[in-house]
Amino acid sequence: MNTETQQKPQKAQKKKSSPLVTAICILVIVCNLVYIFFSQQIHDFVGGRFYQPTSEMEGIIENVGFTWRSDYIMRSTKPELEQADIFNDHCVDDEDVNSALGCYSSADNRIYIYDVKGKELDGVKEAVLMHEVLHAIYDRLSDGRKEALNSDLKNYYEDHKDVFGDYMDAYSEEQYYTELHSIIGQRVYDNDLSDSLKNHYAKYFKNHDATVEFYKKYTAVLNAEEEKIEKAKDALDAMHGILENKRNTYRSNLDSYNKQVDYHNRQTELGNWSQSRYDYLVAQGKRIDEERDALNAYIDEYNVEVEKYNALLEEERQLFGKLDSRFETTTEKTESDNKT
């Protein structure tokens, strides 16, 4: 008798995922989230690692004293010192009446600094680097952080308009707050800042006051030059006033003397000779000659001071020209034209 053995159906077994695969999936998700939320920081960190500054630029960076927060941002912008012609291509707008010392391009995340020459302007490159890095920092802030910061910046500016004058009038609404963020950070000591602004800048500079000192140092040289010009101009104006008084007095005395001579000559022709009148006119003529000589000597003295003043103006022109990349290229072209 044949019998059939009935087998029970087998249940399908669920495949268990490997712990390694699970870990990899989680890691991929985490990496994606990290990149989404920190892509700018990652980009800055990676980009900055390949930056190789010149020895001069490295010294400038060290002098400024960036904190770790700002250092990797700064290095990601690859700051570069440039000669006038190259710098003008990167940073100078032909329609802009103001000179530029540096610029930050958010489009390609680069900072360019004009290679200012002259030991008397020590500190200018540090001040410019600080200013431009502050632009890069502001560019990376969230909208919420910018809104709070803008309020603090605006309050400070409104309370200190006399310090800044009409500086901010040249900036569009789009550029306004990033520029305000840079100039306040570049120019204002901590004890003049609100606590919130002081804490903000402290995140990016190891010693904010020491960094501000670079701006104060080179602008003090410019201010001293302007004060010297102003004092020389005041002295020259005073001399000019004295000269005009002397000249008017001499002309009046000369006119009076000539009239007396004419009168004496007419009287002599009429037979009314007077020895006393003649002696008086001779003495008066000597005084007129002495007055003329004194006037001419004062004119010579005045002209010497005019030459000194003009030399100061040229000195000022050359000094401020060192801060204008267009001045250098114009000077070079003029010198070249003179040689042909």
Describe each model-derived feature in a short phrase.
Residues 2, 22, 26, 30-38, ...:
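Metalloprotease/metallohydrolase-associated module, dominated by Zn2+-dependent proteases
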Residues 117-121, 134, 153:
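Eukaryotic low-complexity, mixed-charge intrinsically disordered interaction/regulatory segments enriched
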Residues 127-140:
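Active-site recognition of the HExxH zinc-binding catalytic motif
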Residues 151, 279-285:
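Short, charged, amphipathic alpha-helical segments
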Residues 243-280:
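Extended alpha-helical coiled-coil "stalk/arm" regions
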Residues 284-340:
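C-terminal amphipathic alpha-helix
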